């Protein structure tokens, strides 16, 4: 990989790490008070039962604790990414996000690119591999003339379904225009939602990602703006 690209991505990773760390905040059942475990009556709700309130049980307490997060970065390397050097901004974003996540003790990152040679996608880094040992697979090349976004996203969903993380998130890095694919974006979104998996987009030099609502992605016109857009992703979309 180009040394300048790597160094810029490494520098960017330092500026986005603190924002990504917020994603480790996971809603978990509180375990502080023994008497709150299981089903118990709520005194305040019991009083209201005379007025017709039927739910008189105490809700399980919830708190935000640091949990293990599985993050899959799915990057578009189709031919259209060569326009306006989008692929360079995409790989810098991919690497920066990967290295930032890797620096956090409870975040685990895997990377997928699509399309890849004769396949619709390729897993270039698994959760148990480091960025450094997978670096040779982070290619700048544009590998295909079609964009099987749905299939690549479904692979990411399946990867997370096979994991035991407390929170599961997918970042799609793309110029936003899927085509030939076994699965539609809608099908993937529905499966992800049913299984508690969050999917957000990082649009590279585009104000539209087909299949994504406007409040589920950010636009990166230049990687110098990546830290600003990651902050939006974390605090406005994934909060």
Task: Give short role names for the model-derived ranges.
Residues 88-90, 125-129, 185-189, 213-218:
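Short secondary-structure boundary/capping segments
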Residues 1-71:
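Acidic/polar low-complexity segments with low predicted structural confidence
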Residues 153-169, 180, 187-239:
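Von Willebrand factor type A / integrin I
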Residues 62-167, 169-173, 201-209:
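Von Willebrand factor
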Residues 81, 179-180:
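Short, solvent-exposed loop/turn segments at secondary-structure junctions
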């Amino acid at each position: 990989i180009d040394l300048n690209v790597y160094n810029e991505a490494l520098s960017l990773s330092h500026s986005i790490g603190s924002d990504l760390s917020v994603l480790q905040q996971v809603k978990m059942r509180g375990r502080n008070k023994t008497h709150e475990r299981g089903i118990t009556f709520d005194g305040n709700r019991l009083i209201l039962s005379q007025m017709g309130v039927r739910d008189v049980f105490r809700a399980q307490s919830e708190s935000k604790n640091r949990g293990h997060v599985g993050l899959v970065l799915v990057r578009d390397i189709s031919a259209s990414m060569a326009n306006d050097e989008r692929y360079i901004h995409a790989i810098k974003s991919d690497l920066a996000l990967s290295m930032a996540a890797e620096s956090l003790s409870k975040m685990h990152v895997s990377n997928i690119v699509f399309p890849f040679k004769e396949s619709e996608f390729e897993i270039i880094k698994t959760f148990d591999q480091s960025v450094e040992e997978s670096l040779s697979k982070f290619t700048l090349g544009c590998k295909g003339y079609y964009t099987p976004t749905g299939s690549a996203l479904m692979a990411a969903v399946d990867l997370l379904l096979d994991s035991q993380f407390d929170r599961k998130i997918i970042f799609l890095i793309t110029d936003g225009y899927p085509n030939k694919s076994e699965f539609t974006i809608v099908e993937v979104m529905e499966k992800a939602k049913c299984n508690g998996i969050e999917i957000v987009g990082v649009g590279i030099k585009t104000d539209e990602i087909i299949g994504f609502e406007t409040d589920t992605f950010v636009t990166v016109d230049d990687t110098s703006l990546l830290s600003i857009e990651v902050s939006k992703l974390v605090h406005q979309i994934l909060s």
